[in-house]
A protein has these predicted regions:
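Short, flexible beta-strand-to-coil junctions
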Residues: 41-44, 49-57, 133-137, 160-165, ...
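Short non-domain terminal segments
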Residues: 7, 74-75, 131, 191
């Protein structure tokens, strides 16, 4: 059965129920990650966990009754200090929670979590925080449940900040190897956003949405041509594999 993964790290509407839409089409979400809101109309609970730098205490940030992240709890908890995001909870029933990534073939140190309060925006007049990624930051799950393997059909989508990007390798969200190693060309499927041009490029100077298929970024060809450079505050990216 085809499945979907969804991430929402930026702005969206609280009434959108992304994974309900996927489920109605027969492609249920097997992972649903968001720092800003619920991705199911019926979901209420944990969105992410933060850690306070002053004493290493942790706090789960839950949804409010409207489905938006309860950032007032975060602001109180992190007052007079700083916090990082340690866990991004999976809202689907699969429990595919993301934690900071372990060492791997491309990076021999564990990744750090993002600053919890750096990507501030609003949703329905409520302040929320996205995930502001910088070098050496990332999340992963290696013991995933129900995620496509091999050449099984899957799709994924991501909402990202359109003004924050770089040319490094590689800002992705998607389905990668579960051993943290490069196991060869074509061994992963993930959405890439940025202006890296070392393995592939689209039109203009970027940034672009491309597919990271391992050992290459795919901008499109033949039936689906390379896309344009993107100039927008927020970007919705989709990949069907």
């Amino acid at each position: 059965m085809k499945t979907a993964t969804a991430v929402l790290l930026g702005l969206a509407t609280a009434t959108a129920t992304t994974c309900d839409i996927y489920d109605a089409a027969g492609t249920p979400c097997v992972a649903a990650h968001s720092l800003t809101r619920s991705l199911y109309a019926s979901y209420s609970g944990r969105l992410y966990q933060i850690k306070r730098s002053s004493d290493k205490a942790t706090l789960n940030i839950n949804t409010t009754p409207g489905g938006v992240a309860d950032t007032s709890a975060q602001d109180f908890f992190c007052a007079q200090t700083t916090c990082t995001v340690e866990i991004i909870y999976d809202q689907s029933s699969r429990q595919n929670h993301l934690t900071t990534a372990p060492p791997g073939g491309a990076h021999n140190k564990s990744d750090a979590g993002v600053a919890a309060s750096k990507a501030k925006t609003t949703m329905h007049r409520q302040p929320v925080y996205g995930a502001y990624f910088e070098g050496g930051m990332g999340y992963r799950i290696d013991n995933s449940n129900g995620v496509a393997v091999g050449d099984e059909a899957e799709s994924m989508y991501m909402v990202a900040g359109g003004r924050h990007y770089n040319g490094g390798c590689c800002f992705d969200y998607g389905n990668a190897e579960t051993n943290n190693l490069d196991t060869g060309a074509g061994s992963m499927e993930a959405i890439y956003f940025g202006n890296s041009s070392g393995w592939g490029r689209a039109k203009g100077k970027g940034p672009w949405i491309m597919a990271d298929l391992e050992n290459g970024l795919w901008a499109g060809r033949e039936r689906v041509g390379p896309g344009p450079s993107i100039d927008a505050e927020y970007v919705t990216a989709m990949l069907k594999g």
